[in-house]
Each structure stands twice: as C-alpha cells, then as structure tokens.
Amino acid sequence: MTCTGVGLHSGAPVSLRIRPANAGAGIVFHRTDLDGFAIEASGRNVARVSYATSLMKKGVLISTTEHLLSAFTGVGIDNAIVELDNLELPILDGSARPFVEMIQKAGIRKQRKARTYLRIVREIELREGDKFIAVYPADAYSVSYSINFPHPLIGKQSFCVRLTNGSYLKEIAPARTFGFLHEADAMRQQGLIRGASIENAIVLNRDEVLNPPLRFPDEFVRHKVLDLIGDLALLGKQILGSVVADRAGHAMHTALVSRILRDRSYWEETALEDEPAMPALASAASLSV
C-alpha cells in the first residue's frame, strides 16, 4: 500500500508505503531516505509529544505517528512495515479514514500465530492539574474521553466507545484533527502546522467553523479518542481495559504507556480463545491523495 501527502507540522512532501510483516514483528517504521533505518512503534522510543507523537532512535525521528497507528488498531493489524521517505507521516485528510480505506483495499489475512493481548489487572491513574488519564481492568477495550475548550462550538464534549463490532470504523476513524485560526501564526513560528490547511483539518475562528460541515456534532472529542487509540498502540499489543481521559493529550497518553511498560504488575499477557490467529495485511494497494 502506498500514499503520498504532506506532513502536518513540517509541511514536507512524503511518500509512505505499508507492507506485510511476519507474525510477532509488530509495527516498525523504516526511513527509506536514511538507508531504511528502523524505528519500532514502541513507547520506549517516544521522543516528542507536543501537538503530535514522535518517535526517535539513535537521533533519527519519525513524527505524527498517531493516526496511522490508530488505524492499525481499529482494523486489528498487529504487524506491518511502514516505509516513508521523510521524517513525518502524511496528514492526508486529518483523520484515520484514508489509512483504514487503504488497509481494507489491501485486505487482511490471519497469520499462523495466536494473537495476544495486554490485559490490565490493576488500575493506573495519572493526574496533572485538571488533566486526567486512567486505565482500569475490563474484559474489552473501551475509551471514555472528555474535553473542555473555551469555544462556542466545542465547549464540554464527552464520548465513549467500546472497540468491538466495527465501532472504530464508523465512529472514530472519520474524525479529523482541528485547530484555531487565531493560533496559527504563533504555531508556525514554532515550526508547527506548516502543512495544515482546510483540506486536512477542521479550522475554527472565534465563533465558527471555516470549512463546514462537521462529520459529527462532537467530531472534536472523537478525534481525541482517535489520537489516544493511536498513542496506546505504542504498548505493542492491544489492551483489554477501560481507558478514561479528561482533557488529556499526547503527553499524558504516552505517560500512561510508559507507566504500563515500566511496571509488569499492572498487566498480564493473554490470548482469547475465540481469536486464534493474528491479523495481517494480505496484499499491497495504493491510494492517490
């Protein structure tokens, strides 16, 4: 599978190709512009978490990983090789839907290895001021997220989803990233959102959306759920647990990942009896963007 686009923050053109990987390989990024240097999609490689999640290994950076990793989780892909020829993944339309469509077009097959999960066995709660994130033991993966923005079209929003029966594809994948016009100049001076446009983000001025319509009335909080799912993919396995977040962001998402990986007493590895094999990409496909 291949696609081309621009990085949300760098504004740099990038080509991305996704290939099948062996069972147990996990998700691995390869910088083809740097002789295929490999960076594993792991919480141990998290480097930057300001407005996006970035991974770094031996000084080599991969930026804005969350949308693709979220799509992988949403369709159940555990193993893939992701090749890109620049430092930042393409933003495409600002959601995970284009990635999901690419994967669906390629097809998914079962691999000859039992799929295992990371089952939460002990609650974890993290707080930072008015920000909060936690995960509690549960038999399935669910997310409950709340946000509060001082904007008349956002305000307080909450959304809950259980990641079963295609809920991700319908309820989460289409939700786009968003930003505020009055913050754009300052962010660009910081080297951010140089690739942002009304084609790849919801853009708001002080009282309206500049590129309507919204895909959901609460698209803003749904996108936060999308980001969280992508960041939690850095655990290396899909979790069985109930995640609750309030005004969190990439920094808190990845802090939770680090806490889980650091202390084995919070989780156990388990397989489900009715899911005997790992899903993987079946073939290659392409998407023009």
Model-derived segments and their meaning:
Residues 1-78, 83-289:
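C-terminal regulatory domains involved in ligand/effector binding and gene-expression control
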